[in-house]
């Protein structure tokens, strides 16, 4: 097999892996429904480019119809190349809107020199995007956070906030007006890096964020990458844990009625079993066999009809 052919096979495997990971997340959390109008938030980074690209692929083949509109917030950062995103979006034929709001000056004016800008910048950006989604009549807002972002958020909350809280794949906004989805929830960052190289996306660096050393999120990210390198499978196991929460073995009295425990009561996950098998669900394993009686992923709630986004469009009459 030639080197070129081998690389093509690897590229095809990568594209298929990403498409199925996104499709699985959409299916598991019922992220996309018939006739949705989805606002895809495009920053110019690798993650949001990949999100838009994969959603376009699914839009072309899915058994339901949904709209996509790309939205970029031009925050008026010095040196921001304003022409890059419009040129790219016009070249691929995606409807888009560029929203111009000078949040850069606001952040610089409000915060003291040397303070990290991410928190305030994020809040300002979120409010503007919610407003834009309402103006466009969008039913969903799609963000480009991936699996590693979700885990990093969990550790940020644990280490610095005293909360066991991550980043949900799907949520309702604080004002209750918007459904926010994260279709890349099952996708590894290292796969997104490879995909961006493969697709040659015109990446726009975030100078405002990149100029800030020792950010807490950056430190956590370095920790996760180090673990992934030194302990293969650890990241997969940690993400699996987010889908296998056992409230009776934590210490939150609002999640579990410890005060009401009685003798003879049977707990769903065992009363005194503190450490379970090291096996992980098949989705995150290396493909080896597992005992399904020991590992269960996200027990089914009340039955809901969910469209399989990875299925094909129905054939039209005469086709």
Curated annotation (Swiss-Prot):
Phylogenetic classification of the source organism: Bacteria, Pseudomonadati, Pseudomonadota, Betaproteobacteria, Neisseriales
Presence of the UniProt keyword Magnesium in the record: yes
Keywords: 4Fe-4S, ATP-binding, Cytoplasm, Iron, Iron-sulfur, Magnesium, Metal-binding, Nucleotide-binding, RNA-binding, Transferase, tRNA processing, tRNA-binding
Gene3D superfamilies xrefs: HUPs (3.40.50.620)
Protein name stated in the entry: tRNA-cytidine(32) 2-sulfurtransferase
Cofactor descriptive note: Binds 1 [4Fe-4S] cluster per subunit. The cluster is chelated by three Cys residues, the fourth Fe has a free coordination site that may bind a sulfur atom transferred from the persulfide of IscS.
PANTHER family linked: AMINOTRAN_5 DOMAIN-CONTAINING PROTEIN (PTHR43686:SF1), SULFURTRANSFERASE-RELATED (PTHR43686)
GO biological process: tRNA thio-modification
Reactions catalysed, as given in the entry: cytidine(32) in tRNA + S-sulfanyl-L-cysteinyl-[cysteine desulfurase] + AH2 + ATP = 2-thiocytidine(32) in tRNA + L-cysteinyl-[cysteine desulfurase] + A + AMP + diphosphate + H(+)
Primary role: Catalyzes the ATP-dependent 2-thiolation of cytidine in position 32 of tRNA, to form 2-thiocytidine (s(2)C32). The sulfur atoms are provided by the cysteine/cysteine desulfurase (IscS) system.
Subcellular location per the Swiss-Prot or TrEMBL entry: Cytoplasm
First-listed, main subcellular location of the protein, grouped into a coarse class: cytoplasm
Membrane-crossing residue ranges in chain numbering: none
GO cellular component terms, A-Z: cytoplasm
Pathway: tRNA modification
Enzyme class: transferase
């Amino acid at each position: 097999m030639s080197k070129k052919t081998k690389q093509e096979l690897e590229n095809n495997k990568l594209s298929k892996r990403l498409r199925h990971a996104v499709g699985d997340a959409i299916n598991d959390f019922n992220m996309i429904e018939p006739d949705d109008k989805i606002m895809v938030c495009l920053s110019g980074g690798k993650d949001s480019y990949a999100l838009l690209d994969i959603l376009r692929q699914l839009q072309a083949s899915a058994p339901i119809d949904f709209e996509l509109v790309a939205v970029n917030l031009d925050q008026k950062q010095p040196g921001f190349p304003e022409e890059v995103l419009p040129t790219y979006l016009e070249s691929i034929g995606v409807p888009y809107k560029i929203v111009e709001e000078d949040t850069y000056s606001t952040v610089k004016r409000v915060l003291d020199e040397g303070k990290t800008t991410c928190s305030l910048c994020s809040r300002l950006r979120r409010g503007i995007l919610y407003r834009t989604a309402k103006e466009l009549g969008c039913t969903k807002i799609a963000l480009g956070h991936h699996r590693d972002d979700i885990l990093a958020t969990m550790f940020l909350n644990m280490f610095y906030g005293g909360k066991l809280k991550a980043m949900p794949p799907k949520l309702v906004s604080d004002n209750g007006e918007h459904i926010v989805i994260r279709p890349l929830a099952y996708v590894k960052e290292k796969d997104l890096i490879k995909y961006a190289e493969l697709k040659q996306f015109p990446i726009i660096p975030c100078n405002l964020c990149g100029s800030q050393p020792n950010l807490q999120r950056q430190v956590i990210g370095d920790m996760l990458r180090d673990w992934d390198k030194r302990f293969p499978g650890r990241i997969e196991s940690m993400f699996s844990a987010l889908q296998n929460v056992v409230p009776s073995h934590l210490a939150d009295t609002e999640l579990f009625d410890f005060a009401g425990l009685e003798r003879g009561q049977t707990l769903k996950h065992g009363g005194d079993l503190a450490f379970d098998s090291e096996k992980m669900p098949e989705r995150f394993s290396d493909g080896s066999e597992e005992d399904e009686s020991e590992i269960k992923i996200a027990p089914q709630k009340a039955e809901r009809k969910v469209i399989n986004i990875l299925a094909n469009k129905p054939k039209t009459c005469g086709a």
